[in-house]
A protein has these predicted regions:
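N-terminal glycine-/serine-/threonine-rich phosphate-binding loop
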Residues: 1-46, 55-65, 74
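General beta-strand structural signal in soluble alpha/beta enzymes
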Residues: 8-10, 44-47, 103-112
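Short, active-site-adjacent cap segments at secondary-structure transitions
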Residues: 14-16, 50-54, 115-119
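Ligand-binding beta-strand-loop-alpha-helix segment within the catalytic cores
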Residues: 63-154
Length: 154
């Protein structure tokens, strides 16, 4: 087993904004990752998932508008879903690239959870756009539920 270890962190912008763009992006990324494996590195791969969480959350919210009895998934579940599908795509692309090179190594995806302080002051001034655009009325409803929203100029 390799003693050389490296953590690779993939940024969310590197995945594109559609499923097809993500598949193309992870195929390119898998080649670079496989190069590291070939060089006898043991990899741990992390990735950002903000845009993917947002896409899932928007889809769930829209589904709720069509099917009134549907209960939308909370943001934490949308985050887990995005970890799963992004990890799945990276895992499959890397496994395929390794097999193409005659390298037989296990590739696994692990979901994570993060504990945050709900009273952290950063929540009062959100800086990342996650979720859908909403009317002032919808924003007021979310605020009454205890969610943080931010007005985007424009």
């Amino acid at each position: 087993m390799s003693k050389k270890k490296v953590v690779v962190s993939l940024g969310h912008e590197s995945f594109g904004n559609t499923t097809l763009a993500q598949w193309d992006a992870v195929k390119v990324t898998a080649k670079a990752l496989a190069d590291l494996v070939e060089a006898d590195y043991q990899l741990t791969i992390t990735h950002s998932n903000g845009p993917q969480v947002s896409m899932i959350h928007k889809a769930m919210t829209e589904l709720r508008r069509v099917y009134i009895d549907y209960t939308p998934a909370p943001m934490c579940v949308c985050s887990a879903m995005s970890q799963g599908y992004v990890g799945y795509d990276i895992q499959n692309a890397l496994r395929a690239e390794l097999l193409d090179r005659g390298i037989f190594k296990t590739v696994s995806t692990i979901l994570t959870q993060v504990c945050v302080d709900p009273y952290d002051e950063a929540f009062y001034e959100p800086t990342k756009l996650i979720g859908r655009y909403m009317s002032r009325e919808d924003a007021d409803i979310e605020i009454k539920k205890g969610n943080y929203v931010r007005e985007i100029p424009g």
